[in-house]
C-alpha cells in the first residue's frame, strides 16, 4: 500500500507538470489575442476563469488530492507498522514526517471539518504514545490517522476511492481489537466493514473487479460470522491483503 500511495503521489506531481506545460503552450498561442476585457453577447463583462498557480481553471476542474494529505495517510500506516513491529526509533522518525505533512496541509484540505479539527489532537496523543513506547495506544492512534485522512479525501476525487482506504483501516482495527479480545469493538468494526464494503462494491465491479468483489464478499461474511477473537484475527490479514488487490483495480495502467 505504501508503494501504491507513493506512486499515486508521483502521478499527481507528474500531472501537475503536464498541466503546467499545457498552460504554457496555451499562453503562447493566445499571445496575439487582445488583452481587453472579454464581454458577452449582451455587452456585459464575461466572468474570467478562476486560475490557480498551475494554470488550471479551478472553477471547472475537479479538486486534486493534495500530496500532503496522501502523505498523512501513508505515514500513518507506516507508523502503525513500525509500532506493530516494535521499531520505535523508526517510529519516531516517521512521526516527525507525519507531523510535517500534517502542518503542510493546504487550508482547503478539509482542515476545518470535524475530521480535520480532530487530526492535531490525535497527532499530539500519538507522538506521546510513540515517545513512551505505548504499543496499543500507538496502534490505535496511528490507525485513527489513516481513518481521518480517508474521511478528508472524498471531495478531492482520489484515484483510489476513500472507502477502499477505510476497508484497510477496518482490517487493522480487526488486528488491534482481536489482540485485545475486545468483543464490543470487534462487532462494531465488523458492522463498519460491512457498510463500507456495501457502499464501494458497485464501483469495484464497474472497474472490472467482479471476481475480486466476490472474494471480498466471502471475507466480509467471515467477519460477520466470527464469534471469537481468534476467528476475527484469522480473517484480518486476508482482508488487508485483499485490499491491495482492490486498490490495484484503480492504479493499474
Spans of features found by a protein language model:
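Mature extracytoplasmic or organellar-lumen-exposed domains after removal of signal/transit peptides
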Residues: 21-253
Amino acid at each position: 500500500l505504501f508503494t501504491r500511495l507513493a506512486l499515486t503521489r508521483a502521478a499527481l506531481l507528474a500531472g501537475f507538470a503536464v498541466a503546467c506545460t499545457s498552460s504554457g503552450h496555451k499562453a503562447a498561442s493566445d499571445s496575439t489575442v487582445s488583452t481587453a476585457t472579454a464581454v458577452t453577447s449582451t455587452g456585459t463583462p464575461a466572468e474570467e476563469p478562476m486560475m490557480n498557480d498551475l494554470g488550471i481553471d479551478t472553477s471547472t476542474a475537479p479538486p486534486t488530492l493534495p500530496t500532503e494529505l496522501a502523505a498523512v495517510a501513508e505515514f500513518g500506516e507506516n507508523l502503525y507498522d513500525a509500532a506493530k513491529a516494535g521499531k520505535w526509533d523508526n517510529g519516531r522518525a516517521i512521526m516527525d514526517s507525519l507531523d510535517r505533512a500534517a502542518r503542510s496541509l493546504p487550508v482547503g484540505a478539509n482542515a476545518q471539518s470535524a475530521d480535520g479539527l480532530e487530526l492535531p489532537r490525535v497527532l499530539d496523543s500519538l507522538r506521546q504514545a510513540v515517545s513512551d513506547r505505548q504499543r496499543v495506544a500507538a496502534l490505535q492512534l496511528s490507525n485513527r490517522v489513516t481513518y481521518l485522512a480517508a474521511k478528508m479525501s472524498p471531495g478531492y476525487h482520489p484515484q483510489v476511492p476513500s472507502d477502499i482506504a477505510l476497508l484497510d483501516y477496518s482490517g487493522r482495527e480487526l488486528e488491534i481489537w482481536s489482540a485485545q479480545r475486545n468483543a464490543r469493538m470487534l462487532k462494531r468494526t465488523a458492522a463498519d466493514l460491512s457498510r463500507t464494503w456495501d457502499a464501494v462494491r458497485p464501483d469495484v465491479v464497474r472497474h472490472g473487479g467482479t471476481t475480486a468483489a466476490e472474494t471480498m464478499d466471502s471475507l466480509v461474511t467471515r467477519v460477520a460470522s466470527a464469534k471469537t477473537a481468534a476467528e476475527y484475527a484469522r480473517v484480518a490479514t486476508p482482508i488487508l491483503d485483499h485490499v491491495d488487490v482492490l486498490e490495484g483495480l484503480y492504479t493499474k495502467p
